[in-house]
């Protein structure tokens, strides 16, 4: 097995091993340290000696021994943990994948969205603290403190390492999906910095979504989220020029879209829509599939897109949904209709000064022939975003309408 294949295998197994240890020993931070030591040992031994027949069992055994050694050397907790420390590490490790339970734990409701995201990437994604810090453009020390506080909050909450029942499980799963959605969005369109994409985050979100889908293939929203990610990610190569400038959807070279991802995503959409209920991720995936089905921008089925946004707006009201519906409405009934719908967002404090609202209004004003209004709103939008790639694009649009 090549070094890259071993690296990929370890990345896949790490959350499973961590889940197994947390279930057995119940201490998140100590288990994570022990798993990292076991992974480090594997990166040294496996290339030289070969991958063991049961690599997951090997990692669980080594990590358990490291954790027990750590417990035995901790004199302050010797009495409390003596029973655990004298346990014999089992030769046969149960073949149970606790990744989903670990994900639910990382997305504990007592944590903020930022902490849930960071802890998920660290514990389940296997990214280092430095990698996560770079992805979100914060100092490594800040990210390390955020992750540490998240672990302490989970410990203080006394959460058990088990799947919640009934309604609580559904609610926690929705939080997991939201966190994966946030990770993907930050990777697909970075909210700040010089790059439009952060491919590592987008790829990691898709990998984790696949993992959840493998364990919950019948869940329509899990399927819908994975489909949405695949259909959106399929456009990545066409979204920027060679110089890194943003290319809007209607101007993209669709021959650059990844047809394999589109085909997979479209099949997942069909599967998810056949279920008994519709959720927001399924509807967003259906919208993405409608765009992917059009060979050119002009062939887009805008009435269908608008109808889907209407349903989405009813079941999951959100100003960004209304914003996107305004674009679809402008394509079906004209820019004035879109502008009228946009005006309903002016009273929403969440959208005050938002660059997306300003840029869409600029685009629709440009379509009506109001170049002065379009120029003003493009400039305001450029000043309102922290993304340098988006700033460049919006400034170029402003220059174009003024020329």
Give the ranges of each region predicted by the language model.
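A short, charge-rich alpha-helical start-of-domain segment used by transcription regulators
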Residues: 1-19, 29, 170-178, 182
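Amphipathic, Lys/Arg- and hydrophobic-enriched alpha-helical face
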Residues: 9-29, 41-45, 104, 189-192, ...
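Structural recognition of an alpha-helix C-terminal capping motif at a helix-to-coil junction
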Residues: 33-40, 53-65, 145
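Arg/Lys-rich amphipathic alpha helix in sigma70-family domain 2
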Residues: 50, 60-82, 156
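Amphipathic helix-loop-helix modules that constitute alpha-helical solenoid scaffolds
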Residues: 78-131, 138-310
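"A position-specific structural signal for the A-helix of alpha-solenoid helical repeats
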Residues: 225, 229-232, 284, 288, ...
